[in-house]
Swiss-Prot record:
Mg(2+) 1 binds at H148. The keyword Metal-binding applies. It catalyses: D-ribose 5-phosphate + ATP = 5-phospho-alpha-D-ribose 1-diphosphate + AMP + H(+). Binds 2 Mg(2+) ions per subunit. The keyword DNA damage does not apply. The gene is prs. One of its GO terms (cellular component) is ribose phosphate diphosphokinase complex. Its EC number is 2.7.6.1. SMART domains: Pribosyltran_N (SM01400). Mg(2+) 2 binds at D187. Pathway: Metabolic intermediate biosynthesis; 5-phospho-alpha-D-ribose 1-diphosphate biosynthesis; 5-phospho-alpha-D-ribose 1-diphosphate from D-ribose 5-phosphate (route I): step 1/1. This is Ribose-phosphate pyrophosphokinase. It comes from the Bacteria.
Length: 331
């Protein structure tokens, strides 16, 4: 995708870590993405030690002075969710005790986001609990991408900048010579997301799959609301976990006469048996995701396309550091 920050602007702004006191540090959940963000900004991924003791306890040490610095900690809380969340909390505490001026948690994938409300008695709202933990640990700001529900921003008592992976997905799809596009929401809850995506796809028509969930990680697709016959169907969701929802939707779209089916999602959780389901012959022409979560080699398959969101995250970090608008990136 086109770089948000041109070389000319970088020169004009004199973007250097020494003069701007911008510091990046990554945990262990997605170091590859952190390196790409650091390269985009022209600052190093700072030195730190993250290790585990024999009893399972985590240890973090920041290995350079960050006193008075604007610190960004890059750590999606993907699997193993609890370890990566705890590591992030320890990193925040270490930076706070090292007298960082401001600490921003960059969480491209926000674990526990699906536990955003009670669906039965005596349940925890774990998305809110996670937000409380981040705030209490000493975070000043959170930068997240494609939260499962936008209302999670309100769980934080600190600023939360919410950005979207859709421009990266749309830029890629625009190069694929697609015709007769229809954007499909895999469930009623994703209609707002699908409608916004369809608008970016030159106001493509919208279809909805009516789905009834029968249990955790289980879903049953019932019917398609809208016309998909003879069209290229783009199934859009925020994440793909086990693949049950989106694969059931794809089968239904094929039955309804869709000539091509492409799956798009920001977050590739890919819990087993997602890869086997998604790679089934003839189901998807492509499965397009981003690198918000690292994908292990054994979970890749021929139809998979992984796009980088490093430039987008890097630009958002730069704008936060410069105290300029983040939302204007998406206007």
């Amino acid at each position: 995708m086109t770089s948000f920050l041109t070389a000319a602007r970088a020169e004009q702004e004199k973007l250097t870590p020494d003069t701007r006191r911008l510091r990046l540090f990554s945990g262990t959940s997605n170091p590859g993405l952190a390196r790409e963000i650091a390269a985009y900004l022209g600052v190093p991924d700072g030195p730190r030690v993250c290790k585990r003791f024999a009893d399972g306890e985590l240890y973090v040490q920041i290995q350079e002075s960050i006193r008075g610095c604007d610190v960004f900690l890059i750590q999606p809380t993907c699997a193993p969710v609890n370890d990566h969340l705890m590591e992030l909390l320890i990193m925040v505490d270490a930076c706070r005790r090292a007298s960082a001026r401001q600490i921003t948690a960059v969480v491209p994938y926000y674990g526990y986001a699906r536990a955003d409300r009670k669906t039965a008695g005596r349940e925890s709202i774990t998305a809110k609990l996670t937000a409380n933990l981040l705030v209490k640990s000493g975070v000043d700001r959170v930068l997240a991408m494609d939260l499962h529900s936008a209302q999670i921003q309100g769980y934080f008592d600190i600023p939360c900048d919410h950005i979207y992976g859709s421009p990266v997905l749309v830029d890629y799809l625009s190069t694929q010579n697609l015709d007769d596009i229809v954007v499909v929401s895999p469930d009623v809850g994703g209609v707002a997301r699908a409608r916004a995506f369809a608008k970016q796809m030159n106001d493509a028509p919208l279809a909805i799959i009516d789905k009834r969930r029968t249990g955790h990680n289980l879903a049953e697709s019932l019917t398609v609301i809208g016309d998909v016959s003879g069209r290229t169907a783009i199934l859009i969701d925020d994440m793909i976990d086990t693949g049950g929802t989106i694969c059931a939707g794809a089968r239904l779209l094929r039955q309804q006469g869709a000539k091509r089916v492409i799956a798009c999602a920001t977050h590739a959780v890919f819990s087993p048996p997602a890869s086997e389901r998604l790679s089934a012959d003839g189901l998807f022409e492509q499965v397009v995701v981003t690198n918000s979560i690292p994908i292990q080699q054994e979970r890749t398959f021929p139809q998979l396309q992984v796009l980088s969101v490093a430039n987008m995250l890097g630009e958002a970090i730069w704008r936060i550091h410069e105290e300029s608008s983040v939302s204007s990136m998406f206007r």
